[in-house]
Swiss-Prot record:
It comes from Arabidopsis thaliana. Glycans are attached at N91, N206, N280, N309. It is a single-pass type II membrane protein. Belongs to the glycosyltransferase 43 family. Keywords: Cell wall biogenesis/degradation, Glycoprotein, Glycosyltransferase, Golgi apparatus, Membrane, Signal-anchor, Transferase, Transmembrane, Transmembrane helix. This is Probable beta-1,4-xylosyltransferase IRX9H. One of its GO terms (molecular function) is xylosyltransferase activity. Expressed in developing interfascicular fibers and xylem cells in stems and developing secondary xylem in roots. SUPFAM superfamilies: Nucleotide-diphospho-sugar transferases (SSF53448).
């Protein structure tokens, strides 16, 4: 019977003999660690599928991905439990504290100042070194300008002149224009084009039997201010007067009641007279007067020569006013006494008044009485009756 002998391939010969070296056996003590690491690496490579094992492929294609998933899952779980950051030591007493503590801020930020941000005349200041908040913003007082008007030849000219003056005044300014019976379309058009914040009111009183229409028109404005509790300085500015910008700038300095001298033309139109207070600084000590018929008045002031705080109308307790009835102008008094009768309801005497400007040394407005004739057209231009004439068309 023939025997078959299997010879070793030359590639498995020990290469140390070929080079002339002597063959040495493996020592267990020196290479045990290397042997263990090589076994772990071989097992890991087999598990991860780096080397292909035909026996493992026969067992099932799902085992190798399952073991791979299991190894990476355990590796990620161990890494997730490993603390990489620093943990602050919290005292046991603070663990269940419900107080909200401020975040830690470096000390160098505490001494830092924030610059002021200025916008026009308004400045805002944030926190300073001491931690105090300072606000330099002071809102300006509202100027409530009341102007009664009526239909006449120069009405549009007067209203536009007052409107152009008010446009140059610093805001806030509210222009209250009061008409009688009905608000005319022409007046509404003028007010819309002025560029001034306005309110167009109508006096519902019958003007035919009224002695002074301006009294009731101003009372309509006072009722409106009291109803809506407008907070500001009220000034009666007739449309036929001439005003300076310095006057409106000085009105915001009034705390309760302010007055100033008004220049006007005499009846002869050939000289100017002065009516108003005599002041020592801001204190009123006397009055200018030129008409003998008006010397019996308590206060010698023109209607456009004073202004007052609007809270007097709707908050009398603030000023300790003794009157329980509303503050209004009176139509029952003699002509020329409307001003003094109204002022007596606002203040008791000169000690509650303020002279504007200081020492009352400037003329801030003029009352000229330069009204045109009531007839809007010269004589002969208007015909009382229509001509009853018919012209046949050819």
């Amino acid at each position: 019977m023939a025997s078959i002998r299997r010879t070793l391939s030359p590639m498995y010969h020990d290469r140390s003999h070929e080079n002339g070296g002597s063959h040495k056996g493996f020592t267990i003590g020196g290479s045990s660690s290397k042997h263990n690491s090589s076994q772990f690496l071989s097992y890991l490579t087999k598990l991860l599928g780096v080397t292909s094992d035909p026996k493992s492929s026969r067992r099932g294609p799902w085992r190798r991905p399952f073991y791979q998933f299991l190894v990476f899952f355990l590796l990620g779980f161990v890494l997730g439990l490993t603390p990489f950051g620093k943990m602050e030591d919290v005292n046991g007493s603070d663990r269940f504290s419900f107080e909200i503590k401020q975040p830690y801020v470096e000390e160098r930020l505490e001494n830092r100042k924030r610059e002021e941000a200025a916008v026009d005349a308004v400045s805002f200041v944030a926190e300073t070194e001491n931690g105090k908040k300072e606000v330099n913003f002071v809102p300006k007082k509202l100027l409530i300008v009341v102007t009664p008007t009526y239909n006449r030849a120069m009405q549009a000219y007067y209203l536009n002149r007052v409107a152009q003056t008010l446009r140059l005044v610093e805001s806030p300014v509210l222009w209250i224009v009061v008409e009688g019976n009905v608000a005319s379309f022409e007046t509404s058009e003028i007010l819309r084009k002025t560029g001034v914040m306005y309110r167009h009111l109508v006096c519902k009183r019958n003007m035919t039997s009224i002695k002074d229409r301006g009294v009731h028109q101003r009372n309509t404005a006072l009722e409106h201010i009291e109803l809506h509790k407008l907070d500001g300085i009220v000034y009666f500015a007739d449309d036929d007067n001439i005003y300076s910008l310095e006057l409106f700038q000085s009105l915001r300095q009034i705390s309760r009641f302010g007055t100033w001298p008004v220049a006007m033309l005499a009846q002869s139109k050939n000289k100017a007279i002065l009516e108003g207070p005599v002041c020592n600084g801001s204190q009123v000590i006397g009055w200018h007067t030129n008409e003998k018929s008006k010397r019996l008045r308590r206060f010698h002031v023109d209607m456009s020569g004073f202004a007052f705080n609007s809270t007097i109308l709707w908050d009398p307790k603030r000023w300790r006013r003794p009157f329980s009835h509303p503050t209004r102008q009176l139509d029952t008094v003699k002509e020329g006494f409307q001003e003094t009768s109204f002022i007596e309801q606002v203040v008791a005497d000169e000690s509650e008044m303020e002279g504007v400007p200081p020492a009352c040394s400037s003329i801030l407005n003029w009352h000229l009485h330069l009204d045109a004739l009531d007839v809007p057209y010269p004589q002969g231009w208007a015909i009382q009756k229509n001509l009853q004439a018919l012209i046949t068309m050819k």
